[in-house]
Amino acid sequence: MTAPEKPVKQEEMAALDVDSGGGGGGGGGHGEYLQQQQQHGNGAVAAAAAAQDTQPSPLALLAATCSKIGPPSPGDDEEEAAAAAGAPAAAGATGDLASAQLGGAPNRWEVLSATPTTIKDEAGNLVQIPSAATSSGQYVLPLQNLQNQQIFSVAPGSDSSNGTVSSVQYQVIPQIQSADGQQVQIGFTGSSDNGGINQESSQIQIIPGSNQTLLASGTPSANIQNLIPQTGQVQVQGVAIGGSSFPGQTQVVANVPLGLPGNITFVPINSVDLDSLGLSGSSQTMTAGINADGHLINTGQAMDSSDNSERTGERVSPDINETNTDTDLFVPTSSSSQLPVTIDSTGILQQNTNSLTTSSGQVHSSDLQGNYIQSPVSEETQAQNIQVSTAQPVVQHLQLQESQQPTSQAQIVQGITPQTIHGVQASGQNISQQALQNLQLQLNPGTFLIQAQTVTPSGQVTWQTFQVQGVQNLQNLQIQNTAAQQITLTPVQTLTLGQVAAGGAFTSTPVSLSTGQLPNLQTVTVNSIDSAGIQLHPGENADSPADIRIKEEEPDPEEWQLSGDSTLNTNDLTHLRVQVVDEEGDQQHQEGKRLRRVACTCPNCKEGGGRGTNLGKKKQHICHIPGCGKVYGKTSHLRAHLRWHSGERPFVCNWMYCGKRFTRSDELQRHRRTHTGEKKFVCPECSKRFMRSDHLAKHIKTHQNKKGIHSSSTVLASVEAARDDTLITAGGTTLILANIQQGSVSGIGTVNTSATSNQDILTNTEIPLQLVTVSGNETME
């Protein structure tokens, strides 16, 4: 049902039939008033018209009608009909509005009966006709007249005495006009045919459109665009469209929970104060470059020195005149860096004398050597200190030098880790510890650069420049050295090798690795070297005399020679001597207990006078362990055999993760070849290599059996050298000692097979060391 477009006239209200129901549903064609659906003759209409003419108003007619009691007379038909029409209105005045109709002027309402009407039949009797719209209970109320009024309605079928009210269906059509002149229509949907609201669903539909139209449908359509369904109770506040607001409406603010990271604050973009954030609109970006010396050169742009002391609460005035300020400065960096400093021999921190001096706070210096945090200092300021926090916090007292100008000056702030500077002295005056005060900085907003350098103990300097944007307050900031320094060693220029003493002990001397004149490098001095696992690499001019002891293995022959195809490098043989000694002396040295030869102390040697059973033969040593009876020709062999019985193994392999122990030194050296893969014994026929000499002897017999030549006519070349006796030259060649089996050494690379006896060849005297050169591409097995 739509709202009435004009008030109901009294003439039209009098034309209604009082006997018909007045609560019928109105549509768009008859929305001006509530129309009765039944009329019963011209007599009733004429009676109602005459009654309306005789009374001044319908309310007076109702009052007069209610006062009459008794059956009506035939002459008063018109008045009784009018009174019958007004009787229900009197009942409705008590509060039952569901049984009445409203009508009248725009500023007042008239009660129209919606109860059963009473008419006369042909016989003259009064007959009540029930109304067809008594169950609808709908009302049409204009909104402009209900601003300050309260309406109480009782639906038909409810009991107003006990307070029980059945479901009431009503319909309100507000008229809202948007900013652009369009009308916003609010439609209500329900389950009934008359377009009322279902209180169970409580759904409100807001339908925008170009004109005001009521969409009265039972259920909302799902395909209607711009239809916003909202369940539950909704309070519609003010809506602002296009930047305009309606009178009497407030702005709607909605809080929507979002899953965002912490420490995020949403600020309206129009209400952001750049000065409160330390960013001034007049600040300029200072760009700079770095020259070849590592200094920062300014391009000449100025930085705004706006004063924000009132907003931030921090004193950043151009001049520092107070002496009791307490402000700690921490400078944050994500990488390892120190502020630029220099250190003299006395350990006092020296500072560059360059300063940025202007009265207006602008930077005019063309050469900024490591100066990007400026602090204007007045004449009264004695000295300041700055606390630089690193991985190991150290309080640094810095030296600030004042320039000759009496005006406010920008001083260079410098710091270094890990040293602590105790002596603080300003230029031209002595400062006591009581005059020290914490540094207070004035930083211009905008972009500036900080150039940091790392000072090494040797005086080398490495530079690092990083950019800081939009920083104004540097309090409670901290430098953190997170990245470790990388030490780079230059190629070796001078090398001093250790010496091998006559006793076989390795005497280490300090090895100095000089870096020369290369920048950004440190000098490293090695004070001690472990003799285990060290390879000597002498250069061309290396002069390192060493006495190398060559041990003779038991199953090998006692003579040394050079192979026929060997070559020698005479530059590598300077001052090198070799001495062939007995294994007993080597055994005594390795054990470290005996310094000279002693007689055998086994029970058989003591009881038998030191000889075996056969007096004419060579001395023999028999094992005294019952059931053994092994015979040895040397006491060292017997002692090694006795260690095998007792389980003593004093010779330990020093190879990484090995640690095997042996009773004999030759067993240990043979075991070492398994780690190094060295095969020292070479076949002269096929150049095949073997680790053990007995394996080589068996292999040579195969060649002798094929050729049918006696073994005494062949020249056997055996290369034997311990791993420590192998020398690797700078050219990549390997020098090994050669074992002479037959003949004598008469020249480099030649073998003389004369009939000289072996005893004349090999003596305990020192002979020049002869080396075999193995090319670098030949594999040493």
Swiss-Prot record:
GO terms for cellular component: chromatin; cytosol; nucleoplasm; nucleus; PML body; protein-DNA complex; transcription repressor complex. It is found in: Nucleus; Nucleus, PML body. A zinc finger (C2H2-type) spans 621-645, 651-675, 681-703. GO terms for molecular function: chromatin binding; DNA-binding transcription factor activity, RNA polymerase II-specific; DNA-binding transcription repressor activity, RNA polymerase II-specific; RNA polymerase II cis-regulatory region sequence-specific DNA binding; RNA polymerase II transcription regulatory region sequence-specific DNA binding; RNA polymerase II-specific DNA-binding transcription factor binding; sequence-specific double-stranded DNA binding; zinc ion binding. It comes from the Eukaryota. A motif (9aaTAD) lies at residues 461-469. InterPro entries: Znf_C2H2_sf, Znf_C2H2_type. There is a cross-link at K551 (Glycyl lysine isopeptide (Lys-Gly) (interchain with G-Cter in SUMO1)). The keyword Phosphoprotein applies. The modification Phosphoserine is found at S73, S563, S566, S646. Keywords: Acetylation, Activator, DNA-binding, Isopeptide bond, Metal-binding, Nucleus, Phosphoprotein, Repeat, Repressor, Transcription, Transcription regulation, Ubl conjugation, Zinc, Zinc-finger. There is a cross-link at K551, K593 (Glycyl lysine isopeptide (Lys-Gly) (interchain with G-Cter in SUMO2)). GO terms for biological process: B cell differentiation; definitive hemopoiesis; embryonic camera-type eye morphogenesis; embryonic placenta development; embryonic process involved in female pregnancy; embryonic skeletal system development; enucleate erythrocyte differentiation; granulocyte differentiation. Residues 32-53 have a biased composition (Low complexity). The modification N6-acetyllysine is found at K551. The 9aaTAD motif is a transactivation domain present in a large number of yeast and animal transcription factors. Transcriptional factor that can act as an activator or repressor depending on isoform and/or post-translational modifications. Binds to GT and GC boxes promoter elements. Competes with SP1 for the GC-box promoters. Weak activator of transcription but can activate a number of genes involved in different processes such as cell-cycle regulation, hormone-induction and house-keeping. This is Transcription factor Sp3. It comes from Homo sapiens. The lineage of its organism: Eukaryota, Metazoa, Chordata, Craniata, Vertebrata. The gene is SP3.
